[in-house]
Amino acid sequence: MEAATVQRFQYSSWNDLRNFEGKPRGSLRYNTQRIKEDKRFRVVALTLDKRRDHRLRSVSDKNSSALLETGSLLHSPFDEEQQILKKKAEEVKPYLNGRSMYLVGMMGSGKTTVGKIMARSLGYTFFDCDTLIEQAMKGTSVAEIFEHFGESVFREKETEALKKLSLMYHQVVVSTGGGAVIRPINWKYMHKGISIWLDVPLEALAHRIAAVGTGSRPLLHDDESGDTYTAALNRLSTIWDARGEAYTKASARVSLENITLKLGYRSVSDLTPAEIAIEAFEQVQSYLEKEDGMARPDGL
């Protein structure tokens, strides 16, 4: 029976990497002091800035043959970004020591997309809580669970999934539902690993949700009049008021506004998922370095 349970909750992410092209936009207004920049991130920021400048120049260059050298393509900006991502993953992995990571944040903040990238970079397995719940409910979608069984049933299944993941698995990256943070028992399970909060401006989140629709997000279904963006922003603001404080319990905070400032971009929508994943690794490493007298791993 145990083997059957493990099989039912197994979920691989590697075949879904085509979803990376979507740029996550997100959720929050949170007053805090600017994250202290360290030498490592300044190097990353400078490299990514140069990469972005190169990408813009390349797009406007009509002579595409200039990208060829001795019969092969030069390294693309994507390749450079992946090299930086791989390097940051290699740096943080000794600190993790096999511990799992749980991504938390408002709905639509990019937890699944960023989580897949982080898992792939570390060689970890990726799980999506919503997908596990749907599998446990014999393929019933999240929206249908809310409609036919109620939110309380969904929350119970969510807690069951987090419990199984925390007790039965190591070296995994888990994308949680936006409301996972409201139940204290869920934090008990997530704190067995490292929790990472993707902090995204509410306005950016509302724009993204308005663009893709609210069909798969039952908590955004309402009868408010007005345009979709305004309705989404109003509902998200209400949800944030109820959950905002809970997100601060996470081990590490990844602020998309801070990344945007560091890299000199105009908007959080300019960020790529890989850039967000790089910042997540930075914040996780910073947290673990400060964690109760933890020594730096040998060779670092």
Swiss-Prot record:
Record text on cofactor binding: Binds 1 Mg(2+) ion per subunit.
Annotated substrate binding sites: D130, R155, G178
Disruption phenotype: No visible phenotype under normal growth conditions.
Listed CDD domains: SK (cd00464)
GO molecular function, one term: ATP binding
One GO CC term on file: chloroplast
Descriptive protein name: Shikimate kinase 2, chloroplastic
